[in-house]
Curated annotation (Swiss-Prot):
Bias type Low complexity, positions: 760-776
Listed name of the protein: Ras-specific guanine nucleotide-releasing factor 2
All copies of domain PH, residue ranges: 22-133, 470-588
Domain remark from Swiss-Prot or TrEMBL: The Ras-GEF domain and the N-terminal Ras-GEF domain form a Ras-binding site and mediate Ras activation. The IQ domain mediates the calcium-dependent interaction with calmodulin but is dispensable for the Ras-GEF activity.
Major localization class: cytoplasm
Region (Responsible of the affinity for farnesylated versus geranylgeranylated Ras): 1052-1081
Domain Ras-GEF: 955-1187
Region feature Disordered, mapped onto this chain: 713-744, 757-826
PROSITE patterns, per the entry: DH_2 (PS50010), IQ (PS50096), PH_DOMAIN (PS50003), RASGEF (PS00720), RASGEF_CAT (PS50009), RASGEF_NTER (PS50212)
Domain DH positions: 243-429
Domain IQ as annotated: residue spans: 205-234
Amino acid sequence: MQKSVRYNEGHALYLAFLARKEGTKRGFLSKKAAEASRWHEKWFALYQNVLFYFEGEQSGRPAGMYLLEGCSCERTPAPPRTNAGPAGARDALDKQYYFTVLFGHEGQKPLELRCEEEQAGKEWMEAIHQASYADILIEREVLMQKYIHLVQIVETEKIAANQLRHQLEDQDTEIERLKSEIVALNKTKERMRPYHTHQEEEDPDIKKIKKVQSFMRGWLCRRKWKTIVQDYICSPHAESMRKRNQIVFTMVEAESEYVHQLYILVNGFLRPLRMAASSKKPPISHDDVSSIFLNSETIMFLHEIFHQGLKARLANWPTLVLADLFDILLPMLNIYQEFVRNHQYSLQVLANCKQNRDFDKLLKQYEGNPACEGRMLETFLTYPMFQIPRYIITLHELLAHTPHEHVERKSLEFAKSKLEELSRVMHDEVSDTENIRKNLAIERMIVEGCDILLDTSQTFIRQGSLIQVPSVERGKLSKVRLGSLSLKKEGERQCFLFTKHFLICTRSSGGKLHLLKTGGVLSLIQCTLIEEPDTSDDDTKGPGHMFGHLDFKIVVEPPDAAPFTVVLLAPSRQEKAAWMSDISQCVDNIRCNGLMTIVFEENSKVTVPHMIKSDARLHKDDTDICFSKTLNSCKVPQIRYASVERLLERLTDLRFLSIDFLNTFLHTYRIFTTAAVVLGKLSDIYKRPFTSIPVRSLELFFATSQNNREHLVDGKSPRLCRKFSSPPPLAVSRTSSPVRARKLSLTSSLNSRIGALDLTTSSSSSSPTTTVHSPAASPPPHTAVPESAPADRAGDSTDMSPCRSPSTTPRHLRYRQPGGQVADSTHCAVSPASAFAIATAAAGHGSPPGFNNERTCDKEFIIRRTATNRVLNVLRHWVSKHSQDFELNNELKMNVLNLLEEVLRDPDLLPQERKATANILRALSQDDQDDIHLKLEDIIQMTDCPKAECFETLSAMELAEQITLLDHIVFRSIPYEEFLGQGWMKLDKNERTPYIMKTSQHFNEMSNLVASQIMNYADISSRANAIEKWVAVADICRCLHNYNGVLEITSALNRSAIYRLKKTWTKVSKQTKALMDKLQKTVSSEGRFKNLRETLKNCNPPAVPYLGMYLTDLAFIEEGTPNFTEEGLVNFSKMRMISHIIREIRQFQQTAYRIDQQPKVIQYLLDKALVIDEDTLYELSLKIEPRLPA
């Protein structure tokens, strides 16, 4: 009997365990049984050259194993199938993959396997093929042969290298030997030549010839080198490098100044306030200090390092490498990002802290430090916001003068891209906080302080000089000439308009403001604006004729004092129209908020704040709009980015109209759209109000209680009925039908709770404080309130004036609420028509029979009247504030006239709407009779004198006045659209911005004239006297607030042709030199013209600022962030910042000087024959005082 083969079972089981865990290939296969042609599914695991199979994947002991050494594996076709069984099963079996493992000797039955997928079968076959140990031995032998071959090659190379080394050493030895031989031969030759050399040196002719040759060679070399140097100096590359170096030098100076500003911020405010917060009675908490000065100290340390690096680079001049410095700065930008995000909150915390008197007193003490130079804390907090845009402009200029192959170019471009990303965020934050900083700056200028400006919800609208007419003496003023010095001096007021208040101040000689003791702060909710005061106080002719129709009246009715009247006089009709538009819009916003809140909440379950919040389009970001956290004057989030369609939609949203949005839109719409598109949108709103208004806005406009739908359909309101004999202009009223007399009155429970809501129009002959009460119907019994109210409601009889609309008709709209409290809501502003529409639409249940015949809720009529209101309101602002648009675009003017004429043909037009339309038509059609604006060309034609004056015969006062007159004429002739788009920096600047270029040309011509007149004198004393006279002219210009003229003269005196005349300057008196230093400090460009800005802030118009200061600001904004985002949205935050700058420029443009023209003086100032060009001036200067020898 043959014995069975023994094997080590324990080791086999261990190998099976390893195969389960680390096998080369594992998985389920079907194995064909030997005894029957049946297939059994087993779990196989291949480990090295042994194949194990298990009953299942979790089986611990193998069912069998196969030794694969010497075997082969090949694919076999599927075996033939019988027809038994379902067809689907046969198809499945045919699709399976079959292969067979064949063993080396005959008589051994092959192992037949199959799997479900062809890919798995191929992987198993490949793994079995590679499992042969014999194949691995063959591969190892091949590798060993290659290794031995490589070792032999290496040894051969080593031997060759040693041989080469020996050859080199031998050659070195040979070279040394040859050198020594050459030296010996040279010494031998030298000993053999002494006689011949002596002979040559002794020949004088040869010696002279050699000297001449040497001189000529040197001269030719020097000439050629000089030519090379001159060519390079004049080459574009050298010019580019000079400009690049100058940019770097300017950057170092600006960085030094910025570090100094941060040093003042940290050491003058942050650290002292930290110490104050640790005192026994701290005026401020440590948390507030941290909130105000977040990261300020870290930013200072960062820029100190950056500044030191810049100075170290200058030590290596002319090689200036800056890219690595920006590489150091870029990773620290997250510090700036935190500062930027905290900026708005920082100013809000500061405004709240200023309400603490102890803190405010301490802060004024810190701001009084001479190092602050009169600047406020919020100014220092804003400096870091402008630094990143400054870096971007510097990088733009550096890249413009950096060749494309320069080693720094890529690094500088990368730094610029990163800084631009942060700059966009910074511009948004600066735009959002502009209003807070403006309010705090005005509050700091007022000596007595003004707590209402510490309310961060106040939005600054407008400022300017107006003349206050004493109302008690109006009968005596008929003989006073308009613009007389006595009236202007005594009655001139600096007025500031905010969304909730109107401030009237006087300015002291030091530039500080003082609020009027009576009527200095007017709450707009208590004011009624009358554009054309009544004529009852004058027996002969009205004040409109007396003051040229430049006066308007504000009737103030405080709840705890007697009513009083403020009469103000505007410098021009255009200024009056602009003031009236802004004041009326602010009053509309506040009045309609209060009115709407009372009416709406009384008659509907939907409150006004809920109506705004429920419209997600007003506060939630979308693909075509993005909002900021700051609220506008209507308590709706300001727009940060938006498409043109969304901006036009906001302009025509009938629920509210924010005055700050409207002003920004009208200032900057040319950047992202055209006047024709804006007018087309207004025309669509008027002609098709329902199709032009978003559906969601219509739904919220008519938001009512859930069960009031049937009342909305039939237009009946049982609880409300409105009545006024003459509706307020543009304040839409409702009637029973469009052709009936429009009489509405508020009755019922609303009438009982808030008092009678009377909408009356005071005629031109009525008293401004007269109140006309319309009889109200008795309220229903279940809502009646007894007439005998509690005694503490003493204010129920106080009459307030609600919405007033843009019209020149004086009128009063009054309403009352319990306790005499004035309805001053913080909700969004809507027109009066909107308020009544919603109130009427949201009426309660049950209608008395008397109301069935009078239709008081016609939705279409309300929408039409409100749309007409909005169109006329926008057009009034547009025409009154931006008349240049229509003067320069006749097609736009004709289209507006056609639209207004179409409005006049509307049979349903209310009388006041008709009058407002006629006023706009009149403003468009007639020339402004009080327009005293002259153009420079007109003055040149008027100065046709036979002989011009000379410099000696003209006084300093005459020169200063006429220079001021010319500068202001040139300055105010610049249309505001030229400030958009940086046209003055483009190649076609003379075509795009002709007036800005003309202003620049006039500045240069006046400066050239000053320098030429000084250089015309041959003797030193005459030149010194001329310098002293021009300095006196500059000082008079300063007194006249002509800072452009000051800079014209000081820049002429600082020209190299005049500044180098040391002998002349020694003859100039010390007082004149000190005065000139004072003038130069005032108009210095240091710190973004900080001294000039502070001076302009403390002076009343008229004034002529330096235009370059504003152009620099606009360039900062334009370079720092694009007009459109990558998604194509308008950057409205940038538009807001541009609008603020244009508003400040136009403030100085619109107030004219009352200086008489002197043709002889003007002809002298404009005579170009007296001007000497720059090169001739310098040559003349060298003749007068030649250069001293070195």
